[in-house]
Amino acid sequence: MEVILKEDIETLGHRGDIVKVADGYGRNYLLPKKLAMEATAANKAVIEQMKASAVRRSAKEKAEAEQLVAQLDAVALVFERKVGDHDHLFGSVTSSDIAQQLEQQGFHIDRRKVQLEEPLKQTGEFLIPVKLHREVTAHVKVTVKGEETAA
């Protein structure tokens, strides 16, 4: 069965792609969940128009993302956290913390775009990727320091 994807599906392809899937998978999963539609001639024509506008929109978004990369690559974030033995943090620095501090500096970045595999639990300097567009990734320098304690 041929279907046209309405959403990006990691195992199949991107939105607007025409893919062959098993009949049961298409009929029982993709179509009822509105993740795809049948690949008829009329639907193919509509998708071609949508693809053309999506290409223009994607090119514009990519250009904006590339401008943002230059700005983000110059950003250095500093977090101070309480530290225990062996420079291990009490707590951690998460993608939400990074996105929040970027927001305070005037960048509107969703926390899900911060590609942090796991929260930072050590002191040091880290280069954290931020995925701005499907093809564009910026890197933000994050420094985690131990909090100064008054003795």
Swiss-Prot record:
The keyword rRNA-binding applies. The lineage of its organism: Bacteria, Pseudomonadati, Acidobacteriota, Terriglobia, Terriglobales. This is Large ribosomal subunit protein bL9. PROSITE patterns: RIBOSOMAL_L9. Keywords: Ribonucleoprotein, Ribosomal protein, RNA-binding, rRNA-binding. Binds to the 23S rRNA. GO terms for cellular component: ribonucleoprotein complex; ribosome. The keyword Isomerase does not apply. It comes from Acidobacterium capsulatum (strain ATCC 51196 / DSM 11244 / BCRC 80197 / JCM 7670 / NBRC 15755 / NCIMB 13165 / 161). GO terms for biological process: translation. GO terms for molecular function: rRNA binding; structural constituent of ribosome. Transmembrane segments: none annotated. PANTHER family: 50S RIBOSOMAL PROTEIN L9. It holds the Pfam family Ribosomal_L9_C. Belongs to the bacterial ribosomal protein bL9 family. InterPro entries: Ribosomal_bL9, Ribosomal_bL9/RNase_H1_N, Ribosomal_bL9_bac/chp, Ribosomal_bL9_C, Ribosomal_bL9_C_sf, Ribosomal_bL9_N, Ribosomal_bL9_N_sf.
